[in-house]
Amino acid sequence: MRILVTPTSLQPGKGSKALETLKAFSDDLVFNELGRPLTEDELIPLLKDCDGYVAGLDSITQKVIDACDHLKVISRYGAGYDRVDIAAAKAKGIPVANTPGVNAEAVGELTFALILAVARRIPYLNDSTRNGEWVRSTGMELKGKTIGIMGLGAIGKVTARCAKGFEMNVIAYDPFINEAYCAEHDIGIRAFDELVQQADVIALHLPLM
């Protein structure tokens, strides 16, 4: 089985355990050598003779799907599949899989690391220290502040849990909010505009569309 692998973190030389697992499954792997998501015209020549497709953030349009008669399955390396023309895949009988929640812990932790970096001005202070300066800056204390989480899915929930550990007040907006979960974890439900007005920190975990 020939498989196209396009996610940039799954390319040779990246030390990915997932790639080693994939190599054990197939010895005919095709890789993305451009180091970025592929366009339609870049994708078709690589994909047209493949049976499987482990997809990154490429543009998987009807044009791409129609050009690939050997394709039997598309598996998104991530939770979202908004870049896949689901209707076109369904019309050709090609199942589309994704991996919801697989990176939630890592992304949620990174989100909070970035919040700390901004609140405590870590990048600026690091640069100034390297330049021989000694800038005194207290930054912003997070305890008691309100974090507004837009999108309370798997990643948003990890971010909320981290924020609770810092004794922050957590509010959330989600068009498909789980009221029972929010009640259980003391998360205030807000409308979009209310969250923007009330939050000291905003974490965005929704598609930009």
PLM regions with names:
Residues 92-94, 100-146, 150, 154, ...:
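Phosphate-binding beta-alpha-beta segment of Rossmann-like dinucleotide-binding domains, i.e.
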Residues 15-17, 137-209:
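Rossmann-like dinucleotide/phosphate-binding beta-alpha-beta segment
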Residues 1-50:
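N-terminal glycine-/charge-rich "phosphate-binding" loop or analogous flexible N-terminal tail
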Residues 82-94:
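Rossmann-fold NAD(P)-binding glycine/threonine-rich loop
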Residues 59-71, 85-88:
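Rossmann-fold NAD(P) dinucleotide-binding segment
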Residues 33, 77-78, 94-105, 174, ...:
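Short beta->alpha connector loops at strand-helix junctions that form conserved
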Residues 50, 68, 198-199:
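An anion/phosphate-binding loop that grips the pyrophosphate of nucleotide cofactors and donors
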